[in-house]
Regions:
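Membrane-interface alpha helices of multi-pass inner-membrane proteins
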Residues: 168-185, 191-196, 220, 224
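Extracytoplasmic catalytic/substrate-binding loops of multi-pass membrane glycan-assembly enzymes
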Residues: 34-50, 61-78, 84-88, 237-239, ...
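Membrane-lumen/periplasm interface segments of specific transmembrane helices
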Residues: 214-253
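Membrane-interface transmembrane helices that cradle and orient dolichyl/undecaprenyl
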Residues: 116, 152-172, 205
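Start-transfer (signal-anchor) and selected internal transmembrane alpha helices
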Residues: 1-30, 110, 166-170, 213-220
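Perimembrane helix-loop-helix junctions
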Residues: 1-6, 190-223
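Aromatic- and kink-enriched transmembrane "portal" helix at the membrane-lumen/periplasm boundary
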Residues: 73, 87, 101, 123-146, ...
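Transmembrane-helix signature of polytopic, membrane-embedded enzymes
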Residues: 105-128, 146-147, 163-168
Length: 271
């Protein structure tokens, strides 16, 4: 066991194992996988069309309609550049995303467990998530947000344990929140909680000035990717379309009243 533990101390070995696990699980569970003759998931095809359009002179929301965020379309667009006629490129990006997710899961688990059990937890988590009902057919907005979620949880643990102001962590996590807002902005709840917990921690330590400065660093980091997206749509004369579709449409089109019991049942049925 000691030899195995020493072997698992190597970062490259951990990444290689997680990469192999990601390749195999997604090969089976994602319809972007080359094992599937075609991908019949409507959303995935819509994302691919949007991404393809971006790299062929079309502007999202102006020339093509779909209501997810522009960063998701960019990801699918890069997948299109890898393979014009199949979802192979998207599958490869899924593998990279899933490997990064797994690595941060490992780092979180490693805070409390030894190398072997931390890796085991990470591998099992990857397998369970990819095999769950909520995974759908693979390539969802939520799936591509998983590395952002895991990295932010890890950074939060690190910043709390080190009891450090951590300006770089605030900027990084602000930027991560900005990226998530450009994929699916209603997933931002975690980052509001992240920042609120850190803010009130500093307040409890009577670090009032640092508490407010930390919010500024976080918001600056968050603004950077959002500003880049705004600049893109301004240059392409589509800022109003961007706002009308991605913000207004998403805030109004799916408004429905669901009681608490139904929400809880829906949550467990997705597992």
């Amino acid at each position: 066991m000691k030899k195995l533990s020493n072997y698992l101390d190597n970062k490259k070995v951990i990444l290689a194992i997680l990469l192999i696990v990601s390749i195999l699980t997604l090969l089976i569970c994602s319809k972007n996988s080359p094992l599937y003759p075609y991908n019949d998931w409507v959303d995935g095809n819509a994302f691919f069309t949007m991404g393809k359009g971006m790299f062929n002179g079309k502007v999202p929301y102006k020339d093509l309609f779909e209501q997810k965020g522009p960063l998701l379309y960019l990801i699918y667009g890069i997948g299109y550049l890898i393979s014009h006629d199949t979802f192979l490129g998207v599958y490869l990006l899924e593998v990279i995303s899933y490997t990064i997710f797994g690595y941060f899961l490992f780092k979180i688990a490693r805070t409390y467990l030894n190398q072997f059990y931390a890796l085991l937890v990470s591998v099992l988590t990857l397998a369970i998530i990819s095999g769950s009902i909520s995974f759908v057919q693979g390539g969802s907005a939520e799936e591509f947000c998983l590395p952002f979620v895991a990295s932010s949880v890890y950074f939060f643990i690190k910043i709390i344990n080190e009891n450090d102001f951590g300006k770089k962590y605030l900027l990084i996590n602000g930027a991560i929140a900005g990226c998530v807002s450009l994929i699916k902005f209603n997933l931002l709840g975690l980052w509001f909680i992240w920042m609120a917990l850190y803010f009130f921690k500093l307040i409890s330590l009577k670090e009032i000035k640092k508490a407010f400065i930390s919010c500024v660093y976080f918001l600056v980091g968050m603004f950077i990717p959002i500003f880049i997206s705004i600049l893109y749509f301004v240059i392409n004369g589509a800022l109003r379309d961007y706002y009308d579709v991605y913000i207004t449409f998403n805030l109004t089109a799916y408004s429905t009243t669901i009681d608490l019991k139904t929400r809880i049942l829906n949550m467990f049925s997705a597992i």
